[in-house]
Structures are given as C-alpha cells and as structure tokens.
Design a protein with these regions (language model features):
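Radical SAM [4Fe-4S] cluster-binding motif and immediate context
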Residues: 309-347
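C-terminal beta-strand edge segments of enzyme domains
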Residues: 296-312
C-alpha cells in the first residue's frame, strides 16, 4: 500500500507472473491507488469535510481557507482526477487560467510558471497546478484527521528505523485513523471476494510498513486462519536481524530477497506438502522465538524460469500523473516510458 501514484509497483506483477507458471491462482491489488481514488472524488471529499467539521480543531489560516473553499474543492475534484489520469486533457487551459481551482498555501511555493513551462507547455503546467491543489488537500488532512497522511507514503517516520518496534507498535494498537478505515474497507472487500489461504504484502519502502501492519492486524482479528507473509525491499534491507516477536502478531512469515522460491515453498507448507524446516530465507515464530529458516534444499529460479510479469487486476487506466516540482525529470518519471529491467532481487 501507498507507493507511486503514476504506476503500480512491479513486485506483485512479477510474483503473479511466476505463480502463473506453477498453475497457482492468485489475485493482486494496489491498495494505495484505490484508497487515493476513494478519498479524492466528490463523494469522498464530501465525507472528508464532514468528518473534519464534526470535531473541534485549532486550525491554522491555511486550513481555515481550505474549509471555507469546501464547495470549490468538492465541485472540481472529479475533473482534476480525470485530467491527471489523462482522460480529460481539454481542461488544461482552464486549469492554467488560475481561476478554476481553489488555491491555498501550496501555491505560495510555486516557481515562475511561465519561466518553467513556457507559453506552450500547458499540459505539464496544468498538471503542476493540479498537483498543488491536491497538496493543499493533503496538508488539510495532515493538520486535522490524519497526521501520518502522505500521497505516496504513509506514516513514513514510524517505519524509517528498524532499531525499535515500540513507536510503530503503539501506533498500530491505537485507534484506527480515517485513512485506516478507508484502507481496511477496501481490503475487506478483497478478502471477502477472494477468500485466500495466504496474503502476501510487498513492503518496498518505510512508508509502506504501517499500512501493511494494519492489513495484517485486520486479518488476525477477523480471519485468523488466513496466513500473512511480508517481503520486499524494506524487509531485505532493514529486517535481516529481526528479533522482536511482536512483529508476528501481524505477520506469520517474513521472506527475504528473491520471493519466487520462498513463496512457492511457503504455499506448499501451508498446504501441508512441506515441513517448516523446508522454508527458504524466511523468518517465523517457533515456540515464541523469532526463527530464521534457510536450510532449504530447493534452489532459486533462473531468470528465464520466472515467467512474464502479469498486471491483471491492477487498475492500469486509473493511475494519476502528478508533477510536484518544476523539474523536467519529474515529467519524465511520471510520463516517460518505463523500461523495467530486472537487475537483482527484482529491483
């Protein structure tokens, strides 16, 4: 959950492609873009403003201004999202007029747009303005109902250090936030529809850790028979010396590095076909002790054996292209051709 808004993170597509070669059915989802789209639409913003107004806040002038412009945001959000999805390019000139979208503090930081985009760069200029519009709404959320909110990361500060689990553990066991509720509503729909035996959560960055723990916690509370595995870049770099057993209140297994062989063996283990000592590059809890198991006789797969990444199930036409900074590289990152190369461990 919560990576880039302009494209799905490729890890799940790689794993799904591999599982296809083994005849193992799987379903994938990008909860980050789904939560973003559930929040940033007319109905979602209406509920958001209602939730904010239902409580007393000590609001700074910027948040007061955004609340005063509530109707302007609610009446323009659907068009902005469609534009950023590339489905409503015709409103670029209207956005660039600076009379269509409400503006708050994010616009104070904008560089000289004419210098940055010239007279003809209407699409990129409009994307930048629309991004600032979303940034203002994001700032309102952070100042009120959810201080951990971020568009491409969530509660990143809690996940930056793996030295201690205390702060993150306390946050996970605190009351669910407004965004948590949206996330878990969507997650529950997938669980009810798919009825999985195993849920694998990719956590590439610190800003994905909190939401993965929330999902694991929800499964343990509502569907304890479902097993939960976590893997990805964060585990590979930060959890190689894992020792805190509290982590396994949310996950059953944590795998390291290339995920294909560990997940295949894990599925066989869950199906009763392999013993726990057969697991590969895997942390789990045995008799209350965090145990790393890596004595498997089964080798990793060669590149030509991994299959083709499969993006089925991802909302490929609904990702949004944003330009946060007046920097040509940001446009290339969002709109340029992505030529995915597997160099090592899926990166």
């Amino acid at each position: 959950p919560f990576t880039q808004l302009n494209t799905p993170y490729p890890a799940t597509a790689y794993i799904k492609g591999f599982l296809n070669t083994k005849g193992i059915p799987s379903v994938q989802a990008d909860l980050g873009i789904e939560v973003t789209l559930a929040l940033f639409n007319k109905e979602g913003l209406t509920k958001l403003f209602q939730a904010i107004r239902s409580k007393e806040w000590e609001l700074n002038p910027n948040c007061q201004r955004i609340l005063a412009l509530e109707n302007n945001y609610i009446n323009t959000i659907d068009q902005v999202i469609l534009f950023l999805q590339g489905k409503l390019d015709t409103i670029a000139h209207l956005i660039c007029s600076r009379t269509f979208l409400p503006e708050a503090d994010a616009f104070d930081q904008m560089d000289d747009l004419d210098w940055a985009f010239g007279a003809m760069g209407k699409q990129d200029k409009a994307k930048h303005i629309a991004t600032m519009y979303l940034e203002d709404l994001g700032n309102l959320i952070k100042e009120t109902i959810d201080p951990y909110f971020g568009f491409s990361r969530y509660a990143e500060s809690l996940g930056r250090s793996a030295n201690s689990f205390d702060e993150l553990y306390a946050a996970i066991n605190a009351q669910q936030s407004y965004l948590d509720n949206i996330l878990l509503d969507i997650f529950e729909q997938y669980i009810q529809k798919v009825q999985p035996k195993l849920v694998c959560i990719s956590v590439p960055f610190p800003g994905n850790l909190y939401t993965s723990l929330r999902c694991g916690q929800w499964i343990k509370q509502h569907h304890p028979s479902i097993k939960v595995a976590m893997g990805g870049g964060f585990a590979n770099t930060e959890l190689r010396s894992l020792s805190d057993p509290r982590v396994f209140e949310f996950y059953d297994f944590i795998t390291l590095d290339d995920g294909e062989a560990p997940i295949e063996i894990l599925i066989d283990h869950i199906d009763g076909k392999k013993e726990v000592h057969d697991l590969k590059r895997c942390f789990t809890l045995l008799n209350g002790v965090v145990t790393y198991i890596n004595e498997s006789i089964y080798p990793d797969y060669k590149q030509h054996q991994l299959g083709t990444p499969d993006y089925e199930g991802l909302l490929l036409d609904q990702y949004i292209s944003v330009i946060e900074l007046v920097n040509p590289m940001h446009s290339l990152w969002s709109d340029g051709r992505w030529n995915k190369l597997t160099m090592a461990h899926g990166c």
